[in-house]
Amino acid sequence: NGIRVNAIAPGYFRTEMNSDYFDTEHGQTYVRSKVPMGRLGQLDELDGPLLLLASEAGSFMTGTIINVDGGHVNNSL
């Protein structure tokens, strides 16, 4: 009882592992073609959704997946 199960589904965010790729022209073209917002996400853009799910503001949410992906999922439909 009282257990909530939610998730954040991040899109493309620059990390140490992928930064070399996203610095290339091919990587930049890929992001512009796949992400309607035309850019990579910034890590601090995950803060709001994370705080929502971790706080009482999200106390009536369960079974929810929050996409933080610049519209990538909707663009692929």
Give a label for each model feature:
Residues 1, 6, 64:
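Rossmann-like NAD(H)/NADP(H) cofactor-binding core
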Residues 9-20:
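Short, flexible catalytic-loop segment of classical short-chain dehydrogenase/reductase
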Residues 10, 51-55:
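Alpha-helical segments that scaffold the active site and NAD(P)H-binding pocket
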Residues 14, 56-57:
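Catalytic "switch" loops of ABC-type ATPases
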Residues 19-20, 29, 44, 60:
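Residue-level preference for short helical/loop micro-motifs built around acidic side chains
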Residues 21-35:
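A short C-terminal helix-loop "cap" of Rossmann-like NAD(P)-dependent dehydrogenase/epimerase domains
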Residues 35-46, 57:
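A conserved structural motif in NAD(P)-dependent oxidoreductases
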Residues 51, 62-77:
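Short C-terminal tail/terminal secondary-structure segment
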